[in-house]
């Protein structure tokens, strides 16, 4: 193989492994460096969602299009499968014409998304070096997906066993999830409960206890073998996409995250796909992202600003509006995609929001570091 056919990837998360799978399918010899000893070790077997409202295509079709097989738990949940509760614990049920989201598991269990992607990559001959941290690369192309670096939003929760039937419940109330939401996801006797916060992180324990009380108020649930977990998401005003179209940043490391509600896994996997496509077809990665990802990311920041200024009366109003619709998918799709009004709000939002990331820079004159973003070609 020529030197151009060897690709280095840093990070075995969804973005890095999606890139590796697509490169291997195209005949590239790919080596992935992962500092942990396995995929998904940042997670505790907690359930998350692949949202299914922002695109015309169903999310399963998108995964198929970007070369990903479903060899992991990926269970559809429609409006009929769950409930929402507003600040006064008023029950809201929504109608959907297709699954609202696909429930997936994160972590190192065999059914997790992380292990499914690992298996797909290894079956294609991708060489994954576990417990290896790569600080710099030579002058060849590299893809870097090393995950979030700072907490722009946090989650505190637990995974547990329960006899409750499969269900999802979402709570929107600043008293239990400031500027965010709390949720319960149950699938096949396993459950994840968490509350998310976009502010007032120091009081996470108080919000968590309040959220747990809210769950016990609206549903009779048995909690067995509970294990607590914490998590965080990180995003930027402007994603840092590449250095000189040579070091390509993917996933949350690059800022590909949903600033509204943190549904960023699809963005991460798509960024890995576009990074691979740019190498396979000799295209400009930055331009691919600007066309296919940035409009939604900018809209998500505009939506974050709008949501942060709704407060509890606004949440009640929105939920009441959603429950009158015959199908909430078109409304959510419109909300998640760009428009003239969202472009105007984005101009306000990008000045209002500053990421908590302190971007440490190296002092190398001709930077080839994978972790910093300085230099004229940084983004």
Residue ranges and their predicted role:
Residues 39-86, 156:
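N-terminal FAD cofactor-binding segment of flavoenzymes
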Residues 19-28, 62:
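A short, Lys/Arg-enriched amphipathic alpha-helix followed by its capping loop at the start of a domain
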Residues 75-76, 203-289:
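FAD/FMN-dependent oxidoreductases across multiple families
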Residues 261, 277-317:
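Active-site-proximal substrate-binding core of FAD-dependent oxidoreductases
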Residues 312-379:
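C-terminal auxiliary extensions adjacent to catalytic cores
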Residues 2-15:
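Beta1/beta-strand and adjacent pyrophosphate-binding region of the FAD-binding site
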Residues 12, 22, 36, 108-228, ...:
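Predominantly flavin-linked oxidoreductase catalytic cores and closely associated redox partners
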Residues 12, 24-46:
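Glycine-rich FAD pyrophosphate-binding loop
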